[in-house]
């Protein structure tokens, strides 16, 4: 496992699964990647999968696809996500909670986790478009540079997630919409969930900003839930904003609430609790708020979120 001086949560990461682990340490992960890269695909085929919805129908998903977009900051910590080993420690600590149903991440992170045996009986969502790097001049030209429907199906995952930022003043938006529509159809053809995360966005002083007003979120939902030739497998991933009851009247799609970049975790938990009572809301899909709490108590933050969902 990692050097505990490098990761404040290293001691919380569980031992590798005896069922499917092909790597016991992070050094093992690198060695497997170097000497037997085909073992990654084998690990995905050996993994015990599970249906997305079971039991009470609620979901608690941990998200970790931010680094692939170059978004490494958390709150006031600009380099919080620099260390992959530290991130993996935090993810493994979160996934060890039996109330956590699964994870959303890019292939690099998911492959590490599957080699470590951390994805047994977990829901897994791949991440599709990471091309619009944070802060870049081409940020809204958000091309599909991550997973595909074929790779997601081949690894026996539950679905794929795509960001759909809509800037009415940026001509690249139409390409993003078309790419998301294709991804919705391709996932549906495999019987897999298309998790769509929409925002109305614009540039303010050169930086892309998401409009989190209720009416803007409602408009983004209407645009994005109409993508593709079928909505049978479409789910929404939405921010918690003011007038959330009105926002949720805009869709019949199953919806997971996202966390965003935390500024006040206590306020975030309170807002989630209220929104989770709305009928179409099926749970949380949260990353930085749970993985990088101010006190670095990942297990405590995750436990609090699980109690809200369950």
Q: What does each of the following model-derived ranges do?
A:
Residues 68, 74-98, 102, 110, ...:
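Alpha/beta enzyme core
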Residues 258-259, 286:
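Thr-Gly-centered strand-to-loop micro-motif
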Residues 72-75, 295-297:
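Short conserved micro-motifs at the rims of enzyme active sites and ligand-binding pockets
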Residues 284-291:
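Short acidic/histidine-rich active-site segments
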Residues 65-66, 261-262, 290:
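Glycine-rich beta-alpha junction loops
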Residues 2-65, 70, 114-121:
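N-terminal amphipathic alpha-helix/helix-capping segment at the start of soluble metabolic enzymes
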Residues 291-310:
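C-terminal helical cap(s) of enzyme catalytic domains, especially alpha/beta-barrels
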Residues 65, 105-106:
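Active-site loop/lid in soluble adenylation, ligation, and acyl-transfer enzymes
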């Amino acid at each position: 496992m990692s050097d505990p001086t490098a990761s404040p949560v290293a001691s919380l990461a569980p031992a590798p699964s005896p069922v499917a682990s092909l790597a016991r340490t992070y050094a093992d992960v690198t060695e497997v990647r170097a000497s037997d890269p085909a073992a990654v695909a084998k690990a995905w085929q050996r993994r015990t999968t599970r249906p997305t919805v079971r039991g009470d129908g609620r979901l608690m998903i941990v998200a970790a696809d931010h680094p692939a977009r170059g978004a490494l900051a958390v709150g006031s910590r600009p380099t919080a996500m620099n260390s992959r080993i530290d991130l993996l420690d935090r993810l493994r600590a979160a996934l060890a909670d039996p109330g956590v149903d699964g994870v959303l991440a890019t292939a690099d992170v998911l492959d590490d986790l599957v080699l470590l045996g951390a994805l047994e009986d977990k829901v897994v969502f791949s991440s599709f478009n990471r091309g619009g790097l944070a802060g870049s001049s081409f940020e809204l030209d958000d091309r599909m540079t991550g997973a595909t429907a074929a790779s997601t199906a081949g690894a026996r995952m539950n679905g794929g997630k795509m960001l759909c930022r809509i800037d009415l003043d940026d001509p690249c938006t139409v390409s993003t919409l078309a790419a998301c529509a294709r991804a919705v159809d391709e996932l549906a053809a495999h019987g897999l969930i298309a998790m769509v995360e929409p925002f109305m966005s614009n540039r303010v002083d050169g930086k892309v900003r998401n409009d989190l007003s209720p009416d803007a979120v409602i408009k983004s939902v209407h645009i994005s839930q109409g993508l593709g030739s079928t909505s049978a497998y479409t789910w929404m991933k939405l921010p918690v904003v003011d007038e959330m009851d009105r926002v949720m009247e805009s869709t019949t799609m199953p919806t997971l609430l996202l966390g965003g970049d935390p500024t006040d975790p206590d306020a975030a938990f309170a807002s989630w609790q209220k929104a989770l009572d709305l009928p179409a809301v099926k749970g949380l899909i949260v990353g930085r708020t749970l993985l990088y709490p101010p006190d670095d108590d990942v297990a405590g933050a995750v436990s609090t979120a699980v109690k809200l969902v369950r």
